[in-house]
UniProtKB/Swiss-Prot annotation:
PANTHER family named in the record: CYTOCHROME C5, PTHR40942
Entries under Pfam families matching the protein: Metallophos (PF00149)
InterPro entries with a match to the protein in the record: ApaH, Calcineurin-like_PHP_ApaH, Metallo-depent_PP-like
Record protein name field: Bis(5'-nucleosyl)-tetraphosphatase, symmetrical
Lineage: superkingdom: Bacteria
Keyword check for Protein transport: no
Alphabetically ordered keywords of this record: Hydrolase
UniProt enzyme class: hydrolase
Function, in words: Hydrolyzes diadenosine 5',5'''-P1,P4-tetraphosphate to yield ADP.
Family: Belongs to the Ap4A hydrolase family.
Organism: Haemophilus influenzae (strain PittGG)
Zinc-finger among keywords: no
EC numbers, comma separated: 3.6.1.41
Gene Ontology molecular-function annotations: bis(5'-nucleosyl)-tetraphosphatase (symmetrical) activity
Length: 275
């Protein structure tokens, strides 16, 4: 039995299959964890969604920002982004079932047995483990069983950009969603900056990656995340695993085998920027 993590798919189905073939993935014995953003700019978003769903208990994803945007478009809250290639999902006969399944995926996965945390963008620098898990559960409860339409309709905001345990209602839920699905750079006072998406060397001096801030949790439990394609080939602290290596940007897809921490990569098999 082996445990694998893979970076953002974003509709890059062929590369995922090549990686799974290379490691001889066996869904009856192995487990595949995905860091979110199953869909968006690649040409096989429907295939990615259907495949991960078909694996059942052999796979576990978390929600990424593109996954949430797909749900928002399904609810007629937002329009499909010009570069997103998701028409096949909307035309699928089981469209409602696919969106229902996606909406029931978590924001955070914690395994005590395997000793990891996984989310799409990372863990807020102001959260300990208990807070991260309770915040994730709070929003997951609404997405899965509550007034998810109202939440998704009102989640598009960059405020509040700083955590406080006193946050309530939509402000609190927006912060939680942004921390788990959109966070990259922060100011030294832990405020989020959503404008900068550049490589680390090109970032303004006042900004630092979330994982370089002082949070004891970052050293207590290994954290696996995606979301940040421009981190490709950048060093990260011990126990911080950044798996989005920009396959949909014509770079490569990265898979990590957890037991021996061996990486596997697959270059993009097509020029996605041509679409």
């Amino acid at each position: 039995m082996a445990t694998y993590f893979v970076g953002d798919l974003q509709g890059c189905y062929d590369e995922l299959q090549l990686l799974l073939e290379r490691v001889d993935f066996n869904p009856t014995q192995d487990k595949l964890y995905l860091v979110g953003d199953l869909v968006a700019r690649g040409d096989k978003s429907l295939e990615c969604l259907c495949f991960v769903k078909s694996l059942g208990n052999a796979a576990q994803t978390v929600l990424g920002n593109h996954d949430l945007h797909l749900i928002a478009t399904a609810l007629d809250i937002k329009k499909v982004k010009p570069r997103d290639r998701v028409d096949a999902i909307f035309n699928a006969p089981d469209f409602d079932e696919q969106i229902h399944w996606l909406r029931h995926q978590p924001l955070l996965v914690h395994s005590e047995e395997l000793n990891f945390l996984m989310s799409h963008a990372g863990i807020s620098p102001d959260w300990d483990l208990k807070t991260a898990k309770s915040c994730a559960a709070e929003v997951e409860q609404i997405l899965q069983h509550g007034d998810f339409h109202y939440l998704i309709e009102n989640m598009y905001s960059e405020q509040p950009d700083r955590w406080s345990p006193d946050l309530q209602g939509l402000a609190r839920h927006r912060y939680i969603i942004n921390a788990f699905t959109r966070m990259r750079f922060c100011y030294l006072d832990h405020r989020f900056d959503f404008a900068c998406k550049s490589p680390l060397k090109d970032a303004p001096a006042e900004l630092t990656p979330w994982f370089n801030l002082d949070n004891p949790l970052y050293k207590q439990i290994p954290i696996v995340f995606g979301h940040w394609a421009s981190l490709v080939d950048e060093p990260t602290p011990k126990g911080i695993y950044a798996l989005d290596t920009g396959c949909v940007w014509n770079n490569r897809m990265t898979m990590l085998r957890w037991e021996d921490k061996q990486f596997f990569t697959q270059s993009a098999v097509k020029n996605y920027s041509d679409f």
